Amino acid sequence: MKIVNTAFHISVSALSGLPEDSFPEIVFAGRSNVGKSTLLNSLTGVKGLAKTSATPGKTRLINYFLINRDVYFVDLPGYGYAAVGHAEKALWGNLLSSYIIQRRSISLVVLLLDSRHPAMQSDRAMISFLESHDRPYGIVLTKYDKLTQKEKVQTGRIMESCAAKAKFIVNYSSFSGKGKSELLAHFDQYICQ
């Protein structure tokens, strides 16, 4: 996939606000502060397209970005830690699960995991959820450049055991761009269906 055109499209807080067109959606999911927005900015080459923050839980809406005028990249709120109350976390959880279960135009879920803390309980729960609803998913290990060689080997083994049904596992560094072309190449088979 070559990205030549990128634009913010819409933010929604309820399923009723989702776009009605039938463009394929590549969905980016992961824990709060795992680097979803940073990854989107890196992939598109547009700094600031997706708002980033050091504070977990800044993304509170489902954000749609129109790519090449015929594909959506969808930035979901993070799961896990966020500086919000239990009631708001429950609303987010219901919104995200309903979206993933009901949205027919989802072509692929890209699950981002912090390579320094792979397969935490919340990540394993998300993997199980995606598999139980037959959603194709791939794994992106973020912050991969911060690992030692030994940690890289250990992380690879952990991921092979807990995400055996993942369509791909890509080691990604937004800093160096490592993994970008590999990840974009994987997207082609999910948007050309």
UniProtKB/Swiss-Prot annotation:
SUPFAM superfamilies assigned: P-loop containing nucleoside triphosphate hydrolases
Domain EngB-type G positions: 22-193
Binding-site residues, GTP: 30-37, 57-61, 75-78, 142-145, 172-174
Keywords on record: Cell cycle, Cell division, GTP-binding, Magnesium, Metal-binding, Nucleotide-binding, Septation
Pfam families: MMR_HSR1
Highest taxon of source: Bacteria
GO MF annotation: an example: metal ion binding
GO biological process: division septum assembly
Record has Cytoplasm as a keyword: no
UniProt binding sites for Mg(2+): 37, 59
Gene3D superfamilies listed in its UniProt record: P-loop containing nucleotide triphosphate hydrolases (3.40.50.300)
Intrachain S-S bonds: none
Recorded GO CC terms: cytosol
InterPro entries documented for this protein: G_ENGB_dom, GTP-bd, GTP-bd_ribosome_bio_YsxC, P-loop_NTPase
Cofactor(s), by name: Mg(2+)
Family from the record: Belongs to the TRAFAC class TrmE-Era-EngA-EngB-Septin-like GTPase superfamily. EngB GTPase family.
Reported function: Necessary for normal cell division and for the maintenance of normal septation.
Stored NCBIfam families: GTPase_YsxC
Name recorded for this polypeptide: Probable GTP-binding protein EngB
Organism the protein comes from: Pelodictyon phaeoclathratiforme (strain DSM 5477 / BU-1)
Organismal lineage: Bacteria, Pseudomonadati, Chlorobiota, Chlorobiia, Chlorobiales
